[in-house]
């Protein structure tokens, strides 16, 4: 999607129930699912770290709370777009089913993991019946590249080896 597909609440496009909402935070994207009448469902980490450290909070959290909130409150001063990017890969479930599936977990605590069970996994599971996260896959790929790079540097002897001291 083009950059001009992003918009803020000052230039609202009308999402439809069941749409995925991608919110652009300073260091990551947060995801929610539009329910209608201005409300979304999303998950937020709850592990006792101050909310001003939201991105750091999501890295260290193992639990999240399922919330139904106004879209404008979730977005705040950030920008967002409607992004049903997986529709060509996974057929969306009927809207009525998506909304029904969304109502059950509201207010519940759920397991959270930045790489395998994050906010994007949560909303795509509701929309498609399949939890997927391109953002998490990129992070996993980056971690793999860094680990492989360290292995190569170590193998080639580019990192200094510790000298054993003889006594």
From Swiss-Prot:
The record's GO CC annotations read: cytoplasm; cytosol; endoplasmic reticulum; lysosome; membrane; mitochondrion; nuclear envelope lumen; nucleus
Question: Could you list which ranges are Cytoplasmic topological domains?
Answer: 1-138
Q: Which residues form the active site?
A: 30, 119
GO terms classed as biological process: ether lipid metabolic process; lens fiber cell differentiation; lipid catabolic process; organelle disassembly; peroxisome organization; phosphatidylcholine metabolic process; Ras protein signal transduction; regulation of cell growth
Q: Where are the transmembrane segments?
A: 139-159
Q: Does the keyword Transmembrane helix apply?
A: yes
Lumenal compartment spans:
160-167
Checking InterPro entries in the record gives: H-rev107_PLA/AT, LRAT_dom
E.C. code:
2.3.1.-, 3.1.1.32, 3.1.1.4
- Where does the LRAT domain start and stop, copy by copy? 20-135
Does Transmembrane helix show up as a keyword for this record?
yes
For this UniProt record, the keywords arranged alphabetically read as follows: Cytoplasm, Hydrolase, Lipid degradation, Lipid metabolism, Membrane, Nucleus, Transferase, Transmembrane, Transmembrane helix
The UniProt GO MF terms for this protein read:
N-acyltransferase activity; O-acyltransferase activity; phospholipase A1 activity; phospholipase A2 activity; phospholipase activity
Name the catalysed reactions. Answer: a 1,2-diacyl-sn-glycero-3-phosphocholine + H2O = a 1-acyl-sn-glycero-3-phosphocholine + a fatty acid + H(+); a 1,2-diacyl-sn-glycero-3-phosphocholine + H2O = a 2-acyl-sn-glycero-3-phosphocholine + a fatty acid + H(+); 1,2-dihexadecanoyl-sn-glycero-3-phosphocholine + H2O = 2-hexadecanoyl-sn-glycero-3-phosphocholine + hexadecanoate + H(+); 1,2-dihexadecanoyl-sn-glycero-3-phosphocholine + H2O = 1-hexadecanoyl-sn-glycero-3-phosphocholine + hexadecanoate + H(+)
- Function per UniProt: Exhibits both phospholipase A1/2 and acyltransferase activities. Shows phospholipase A1 (PLA1) and A2 (PLA2) activity, catalyzing the calcium-independent release of fatty acids from the sn-1 or sn-2 position of glycerophospholipids. Shows O-acyltransferase activity, catalyzing the transfer of a fatty acyl group from glycerophospholipid to the hydroxyl group of lysophospholipid.
Q: Give the record's family classification.
A: Belongs to the H-rev107 family.
Q: What is this protein called?
A: Phospholipase A and acyltransferase 1
- Lineage in the entry? Eukaryota, Metazoa, Chordata, Craniata, Vertebrata
Recorded name of the encoding gene: Plaat1
